[in-house]
């Protein structure tokens, strides 16, 4: 049986793995096996936290909405506002409305009063 030398492939794989764990501390940035574990862990956490970010920013936009509605003096809350917007088929999504409220609160208040009456 012929001899199979895998040095190049192994070196290439390890080099790629070590480049992906630059900045890690301890053995995770210097040794091959812990580096593999560390990179897999990092990829797993990055996936989880991307999903978590969506929930966090949604929660933030709801808090912003409630604050903006209270400041405008209208007698309803976030869930009532979303129900009215869906009722009138408003094409602006929650993120756009939240940014509108932050950047131009007068227009936001006029828009909410339009949907309220």
UniProtKB/Swiss-Prot annotation:
Its main location: plastid. InterPro entries: Ribosomal_bL20, Ribosomal_protein_bL20_C. GO terms for molecular function: rRNA binding; structural constituent of ribosome. GO terms for cellular component: chloroplast; ribonucleoprotein complex; ribosome. CDD domains: Ribosomal_L20 (cd07026). It is found in: Plastid, Chloroplast. Pfam families: Ribosomal_L20. GO terms for biological process: ribosomal large subunit assembly; translation. The keyword Transmembrane does not apply. The keyword RNA-binding applies. Keywords: Chloroplast, Plastid, Ribonucleoprotein, Ribosomal protein, RNA-binding, rRNA-binding. Binds directly to 23S ribosomal RNA and is necessary for the in vitro assembly process of the 50S ribosomal subunit. It is not involved in the protein synthesizing functions of that subunit. Belongs to the bacterial ribosomal protein bL20 family. This is Large ribosomal subunit protein bL20c. It comes from Bigelowiella natans (Pedinomonas minutissima). The gene is rpl20.
């Amino acid at each position: 049986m012929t001899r199979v030398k895998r040095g190049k492939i192994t070196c290439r794989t390890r080099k790629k793995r070590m480049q992906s764990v630059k900045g890690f501390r301890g053995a995770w940035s210097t040794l091959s096996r812990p580096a593999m574990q560390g990179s897999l862990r990092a990829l797993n956490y990055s996936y989880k936290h991307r999903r978590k970010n969506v929930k966090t920013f949604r929660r933030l936009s709801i808090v912003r909405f409630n604050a903006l509605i209270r400041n405008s003096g209208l007698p309803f809350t976030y869930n009532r506002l979303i129900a009215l917007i869906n009722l009138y088929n408003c094409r602006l999504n929650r993120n756009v409305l939240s940014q509108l409220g932050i950047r131009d609160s007068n227009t936001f208040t006029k828009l909410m009063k339009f949907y309220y009456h």
